[in-house]
Amino acid sequence: MSESLHFTRHGPILEITLDRPKANAIDAKTSFEMGEVFLNFRDDPELRVAIITGGGEKFFSAGWDLKAAAEGEAPDADFGPGGFAGLTEIFDLDKPVIAAVNGYAFGGGFELALAADFIVCADNASFALPEAKLGIVPDSGGVLRLPKLLPPAIVNEMLMTGRRMDAEEALRWGIVNRVVSQQALMDSARELAQQLVNSAPLAIAALKEIYRATSEMPVEEGYRYIRSGALKHYPSVLHSEDAIEGPQAFAEKRDPVWKGR
């Protein structure tokens, strides 16, 4: 694909590494390439889970490439399919993505991690949205996703002052799933990915679809929507071969063999 992105398939698991000097910052060209990778992941029936990480041990990603900005790349430039970093605006991705945060996740790098379904981070990781100090706004998800995760006082401080949050604080607030040593990071992310592979793919797709559609609804309204037939994956799960295989495998005390149908 490019010198900035490396990806490896391990069976149903896709590992993507952003490796771009300096600080794994992302310009429009790199963002386009990342979007193509994530769309290919979405559309490949053999792939079940993606892991995105950064090259090196210091930066997951510093976000938007300020050198490109200084050379004329506009904040509202076309960053390609999936929005900034290829993931922040994909709203029909029904497969899980794990962000393995290996260091600083600043600005758009933090927004990329927030767009993932799970965050596993190294104990040296830290998170920040410093855009206001640069005269811009974290509009690739930071200003939208962070308020769903944190109390207003913390959100305001992070958005308006750019203050950093370390890995342990992020764990306490529930922003990240796991904090591990730098050396154990990828093993931990791969372990989580394998746990996800062990779950039925249609069920995972339905869960993501339901959550995406109903997360802002009152519970009663959410129930009505689920039963309305408007969803794509949920009805398919109910009448799938996997819905038969799961209980049957449990009764027979064996691992299920998922077919994704």
UniProtKB/Swiss-Prot annotation:
Q: Which GO terms describe its molecular function?
A: hydro-lyase activity; L-carnitine CoA-transferase activity
The family database entries (SUPFAM superfamilies) matched by this protein are listed as:
ClpP/crotonase
Instruction: Write the protein's name.
Output: Carnitinyl-CoA dehydratase
Q: What keywords sit in the KW lines?
A: Lyase
In its UniProt entry, the species of origin is given as Citrobacter koseri (strain ATCC BAA-895 / CDC 4225-83 / SGSC4696)
Provide the organism lineage as a comma list. Bacteria, Pseudomonadati, Pseudomonadota, Gammaproteobacteria, Enterobacterales
- Report the EC number(s), separated by commas if there are several: 4.2.1.149
Among PANTHER family, the record links this protein to:
ENOYL-COA HYDRATASE, MITOCHONDRIAL, ENOYL-COA HYDRATASE-RELATED
Catalytic activity, as annotated = (R)-carnitinyl-CoA = crotonobetainyl-CoA + H2O
